[in-house]
């Protein structure tokens, strides 16, 4: 049995005439975390968006946990629940508290009970040393604090 959870083979993606992803190959092993880094405009976000099917790739194959990503999106919620992302812009909802930002996806995507999601969020907020800010809103925090909240939010999707 393979320990590969994400397999990307010869993936290509264009926006019009501009090829943003060219022959991308990548294997991610189960329980490993990776960082996709590179200069602005190099396709990092596009690659991640293809992995969770927010964007469609035009050539190649992407397999997540044994499910090949095709036009058939019946398993997409399960796949999205397994792919966590943290972006340079934190995209926290300004009208929600930090705690609510962290619990939103586990409750709506994973159907986790609210109390369990709150306990999980507090665990991860403690991990990034910002649990004392849980009831504040993003606009009340510094950029670094917002970044740590975004990391905790991604961790909440386990």
Q: What function would you assign to each model-found segment?
A:
Residues 3-158:
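ABC family nucleotide-binding domain
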């Amino acid at each position: 049995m393979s320990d590969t959870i994400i397999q990307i083979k010869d993936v290509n993606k264009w926006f019009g005439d501009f090829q943003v992803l060219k022959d991308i190959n990548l294997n991610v092993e189960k329980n490993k975390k990776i960082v996709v880094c590179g200069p602005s405009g190099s396709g990092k976000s596009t690659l991640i968006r293809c992995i969770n099917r927010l964007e469609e790739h035009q050539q190649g194959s992407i397999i997540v946990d044994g499910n090949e990503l095709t036009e058939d999106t019946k398993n997409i919620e399960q796949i999205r629940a397994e792919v966590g992302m943290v972006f340079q812009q934190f995209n926290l909802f300004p009208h929600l508290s930090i705690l609510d930002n962290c619990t939103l996806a586990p409750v709506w995507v994973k159907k986790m009970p609210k109390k369990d999601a709150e306990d999980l969020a507090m665990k991860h907020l403690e991990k990034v040393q910002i649990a004392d800010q849980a009831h504040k809103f993003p606009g009340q925090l510094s950029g670094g604090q917002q970044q740590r909240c975004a990391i905790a939010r991604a961790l909440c999707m386990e």
